[in-house]
């Protein structure tokens, strides 16, 4: 079966879970054509992402004249479908902060994608994220292209669900996917009750084969913590220097490694200096998947101080690497992190509670940390094997294709 995947920006370092899902579908024998509106080749550091770039069709590279021509052609040859798509784009644009003009651009993008899906013989479109990628997928369907489904991740979609017309997108789709039960509950808030059966839970996943049996915990030196993610307001990294300083004031010996980059890097560096913890912090920048696994192997635990989340891939990766997780008790985190079993949960935004858990982790014997890591590894392998989750997605697509 030939299907299309549609994203706004792909590939990029923060959506490696999409790549893993696509590859898992291809291992099942499916042919997947990648569409993205754009991608930044210069920003890619992982060789696997570079390879994906070469396999991805970038819609905006077609240029404005070609997109406009595709829209005009469909307006003339499929006037009823074009009228439906135009009405949807106008309606959605009226709700959105991006406005109706931007949605006319989405309509032109959809016309181009509809033409390409027909030329490629694609029978279904799956969009990731409930943002403009799902909008374009819905418009492609209106224009006479294949049916569509989409995956909602959060937290961004849940910040502006009405502006994104999430309820309308669920109603128009063959099915909608949430990556956690928390995500499904949030999507259900904006979908009509009659459409709730369309909303299914399929987890993002890891490739178990890439995570061999964990090595031993670091035997000497301070408690080694690592945090991984984009330096953005929702990830809460600004809280870490304060919590680190509090823990050190109590005599806790620890070191923190921050993996990632982003718009808040300067503020994070300033907070590190302000709290006097520069000697206990390492910033690595972005690392590829192999680099992330090396950092996890050199740590005792992952810390994730997020203010908003979906269901973080870094939690899955840390657990697969046999490392306990300190995470905020928000969104999908409690679906993975079991307090006292696979890690610890902390109220979001509470630096003092974070410092308490740093002290708790530092006082926990290495053998117990390793035991918690093994429990986490078993849990994530059972719940987040990407081949198993992709097979569930494939069955939903197959069901959607039945008359």
Q: Each predicted region: which residue ranges?
A:
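Aromatic "clamp/platform" in nucleotide-sugar-dependent glycosyltransferases that forms part
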Residues: 307
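Short hydrophobic beta-strand element within catalytic cores of glycosyltransferases
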Residues: 324-327, 337
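Carbohydrate-associated surface elements
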Residues: 182, 205
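A short, well-ordered alpha-helix in the C-terminal region of glycosyltransferases
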Residues: 360, 368-382, 389-394
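Nucleotide-activated donor-binding/catalytic signature segment of Leloir-type glycosyltransferases, i.e.
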Residues: 269-287
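Conserved acidic donor-binding segment of nucleotide-sugar-dependent glycosyltransferases
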Residues: 339-340, 344-351, 360-366
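Conserved donor-binding/catalytic core segment of Leloir-type glycosyltransferases
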Residues: 217-244, 257
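Short alpha-helical donor nucleotide-sugar binding micro-motif in glycosyltransferases
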Residues: 170, 286-287, 294-299
């Amino acid at each position: 079966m030939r299907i299309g995947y549609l994203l706004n920006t792909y590939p990029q370092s923060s959506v490696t879970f999409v790549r893993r899902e696509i590859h898992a579908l291809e291992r099942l024998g499916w042919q997947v054509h990648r569409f993205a509106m754009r991608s930044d080749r210069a920003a890619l550091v992982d060789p696997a992402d570079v390879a994906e770039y070469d396999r991805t069709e970038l819609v905006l590279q077609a240029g404005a004249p070609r997109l406009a021509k595709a829209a005009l052609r469909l307006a003339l040859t499929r006037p009823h479908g074009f009228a439906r798509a135009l009405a949807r784009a106008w309606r959605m644009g009226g709700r959105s902060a991006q406005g109706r003009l931007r949605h006319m651009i989405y309509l032109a993008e959809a016309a181009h994608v509809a033409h390409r899906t027909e030329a490629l013989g694609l029978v279904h479109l799956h969009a990731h994220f409930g943002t403009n990628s799902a909008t374009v997928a819905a418009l492609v369907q209106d224009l006479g292209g294949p049916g569509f489904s989409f995956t909602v991740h959060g937290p961004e979609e849940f910040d502006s669900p009405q502006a994104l017309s999430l309820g309308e997108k669920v109603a128009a789709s063959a099915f909608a996917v949430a990556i956690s039960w928390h995500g499904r509950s949030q999507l259900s808030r904006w979908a009509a009750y009659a459409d709730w059966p369309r909303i299914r839970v399929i987890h993002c996943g890891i490739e178990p084969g890439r995570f061999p049996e964990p090595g031993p915990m670091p035997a000497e030196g301070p408690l080694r913590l690592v945090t991984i993610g984009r330096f953005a307001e929702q990830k809460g990294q600004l809280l870490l220097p304060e919590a680190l300083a509090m823990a050190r004031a109590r005599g806790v010996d620890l070191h923190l490694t921050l993996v990632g980059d982003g718009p808040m890097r300067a503020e994070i560096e300033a907070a590190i200096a302000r709290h006097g913890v520069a000697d206990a912090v390492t910033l690595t920048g972005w690392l590829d998947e192999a680099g992330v696994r090396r950092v996890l192997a050199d740590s005792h635990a992952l810390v994730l101080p997020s203010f908003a989340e979906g269901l973080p891939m870094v939690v899955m990766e840390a657990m697969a690497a046999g490392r306990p997780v300190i995470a905020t008790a928000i969104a999908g985190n409690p679906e993975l992190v079991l307090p006292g079993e696979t890690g610890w949960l902390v109220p979001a935004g509470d630096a003092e509670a974070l410092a308490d858990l740093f002290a708790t982790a530092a006082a926990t014997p290495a053998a117990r940390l390793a035991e918690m890591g093994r429990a986490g590894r078993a849990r994530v392998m059972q719940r987040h094997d990407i081949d198993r989750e992709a097979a569930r997605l494939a069955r939903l697509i197959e069901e959607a294709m039945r008359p």
